């Protein structure tokens, strides 16, 4: 009798089937201790110590992941994590169990510096390519290694000061913002300013990216684009799909190695609609640059420069003729150009409404530097930088409400972090290849070790003579080679919009049930949780 005949008998198959549940239970029980035993041995080989605390979550970290999703839905994720780190675990760097893997969590600036700068080549984006990249494409925020380097070299020339400091364009959109807010306040009195800030930043971002604004601040705008398949898509429909994709990408990120479970038909439909909308403008850019090549591209460039017009998609079409590459980069830039700035403006209004003394002091500086509503002085990038208290206020908003409160990198090789191991948390810790290292800028920015006992308080005056013990304790735009390319654009838009608002209004009133502290809704970026920032200007 052959061996295969023995193996394939009904009795043997039944025995194997009966063993499967036992094997699965054994895997659940033994996976964690075996991995930790190996990790302890590997750490000693690399002359590292074990982290002081290990957050276990049976089985396989699934319960902890479900808890994170639950707290994210209730808008308490960041607060719960803060309480765990500083009060429950009392560990600034620790191991935690996630589905099918262990992760490292840290709030140490020296570790963050190591990840983002000194050992930059030891870390990549890991699963982000699959969790987020499959949603928003292969762009600068989802690529690692050579792909990221190529994206960076392609995009860096597009973000020079002359190209991103678009004072006139931002000013015109800020004027439309104020008109629309005034119209809304005549009807409802109290309004959610975050809703209008998202429209503002969408309009400025699309004008920068496409050469024409979506005009979402214009209530009479009913325009739409015609996609390649002949379907019509409005700006409102695009935003609906875009917002869905942001939330979906965040769920895929939290799900760790089982991200592939999130692949619904609704997701695919929204992705197709959002891509089709951007493809319309990509096709226009490719056609325009192709036409220009046949009719003296030098003349067309000269005309564009003389009019002060800069269009991101047109410039990208001169660098690459691949429509998917252009679309993916636009998708990636839009995340930074729209959501982060709108969120920061919203948090700024929250803090100013809660702190009328700060509002009054800032308004006094604005009127002194930039003139009144009736006698506005011409704004410039240089003039905006000459308002010290405005800069202090923006820095304090970015400190307490960072738009990327939680981030991660994945080790591409066995490596180490300088501190976090041993009873005193001062020894190096081992990071195995493939391990995700999460870091929380939200917690670093609220750490009393660097910011003092009033770290949780909104106090722009702290920036007047501030000298941080560690410059990596303030990272509103990330750090190292992957530092945000568009930070100057964001700061210009933030500053100019606040100036125009404070020229227009002399008072902010808080709406009903206005929260004492901002409530964070966390997707790929942070924003104020519903019902938003409900105020009335006068």
Swiss-Prot record:
Cross-referenced PANTHER family: P450, PUTATIVE (EUROFUNG)-RELATED (PTHR24287:SF1)
Keywords: Heme, Iron, Membrane, Metal-binding, Monooxygenase, Oxidoreductase, Transmembrane, Transmembrane helix
Free-text function comment from the UniProt entry: Catalyzes the first step of sophorolipid biosynthesis. Catalyzes the terminal (at the omega-position) or subterminal (at the omega(-1)-position) hydroxylation of a fatty acid. This converts the fatty acid to a substrate for the subsequent glycosyltransferase reactions.
Coarse class of the protein's main subcellular location: membrane
Enzyme Commission number(s) of this protein: 1.14.14.80
Temperature notes for this entry: Optimum temperature is 25-30 degrees Celsius.
Pfam families tied to this protein: p450 (PF00067)
Cofactor: heme
Reaction catalysed by this enzyme: an omega-methyl-long-chain fatty acid + reduced [NADPH--hemoprotein reductase] + O2 = an omega-hydroxy-long-chain fatty acid + oxidized [NADPH--hemoprotein reductase] + H2O + H(+); an (omega-1)-ethyl fatty acid + reduced [NADPH--hemoprotein reductase] + O2 = an (omega-1)-hydroxy-long-chain fatty acid + oxidized [NADPH--hemoprotein reductase] + H2O + H(+); (9Z)-octadecenoate + reduced [NADPH--hemoprotein reductase] + O2 = 18-hydroxy-(9Z)-octadecenoate + oxidized [NADPH--hemoprotein reductase] + H2O + H(+); (9Z)-octadecenoate + reduced [NADPH--hemoprotein reductase] + O2 = 17-hydroxy-(9Z)-octadecenoate + oxidized [NADPH--hemoprotein reductase] + H2O + H(+)
InterPro entries in alphabetical order: Cyt_P450 (IPR001128), Cyt_P450_CS (IPR017972), Cyt_P450_E_CYP52_ascomycetes (IPR002974), Cyt_P450_E_CYP52_fungi (IPR047146), Cyt_P450_E_grp-II (IPR002402), Cyt_P450_sf (IPR036396)
GO cellular component: membrane
UniProt-annotated location(s): Membrane
UniProt organism field: Starmerella bombicola (Yeast)
SUPFAM superfamilies associated with the record: Cytochrome P450
GO molecular function, one term: iron ion binding
Name of this chain's protein: Cytochrome P450 52-M1
Residue intervals passing through the bilayer: 18-38
Amino-acid positions noted as binding heme in the UniProt annotation, renumbered to this chain: 484
pH dependence per the entry: Optimum pH is 7.
Family (UniProt): Belongs to the cytochrome P450 family.
Membrane topology: Single-pass membrane protein
PROSITE patterns xref list: CYTOCHROME_P450 (PS00086)
Induction: Only expressed in stationary phase.
